[in-house]
């Protein structure tokens, strides 16, 4: 049987004629890797002093948060009254975020520092919070409570860290918010 198949193949090739040869492509020189990969004009430096990017789809400060049922029947955290300006009597400042897909659980940390607040040292942390993000979580929040019961007017900086612990490599970005001076009632 195999010899019959081979004989038919030879006859068929003979009847069809010789197949046309493809034109040979010219040999091109190999371009250096920097010409097409890791080009300096394509590299945008990452700004750790700006709101985090990368794994964060959105991140914002807000007066509160709400939990809604997402379209995949997951719990979705949404900001309530997003703003970066708060009153001194605000009970807490919330940082609400939505994440891109991730393949393992981790923690998101927020460390609050007074950036420009009269009477407070900008190098001393005044508050922090952490949230464990499970594999199925797509959103979350951090809660920052006022130091000594009330916020002092001024500008505050929140370092956002991601990982298992806070260190110099876990910093993803910085959020800022302002506590306005109390208006005369």
Question: What spans do the regions from the language model cover?
Answer:
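Bacterial N-terminal signal peptides that target proteins for export
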Residues: 1-5
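Bacterial N-terminal signal peptides
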Residues: 6-16
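Sec/Tat signal peptide C-region and signal peptidase I cleavage site
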Residues: 18-21
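Contiguous segments within soluble domain cores/interaction surfaces
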Residues: 24-148, 152-153, 159-163, 167-171, ...
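Short, solvent-exposed mixed-charge patches
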Residues: 183-185
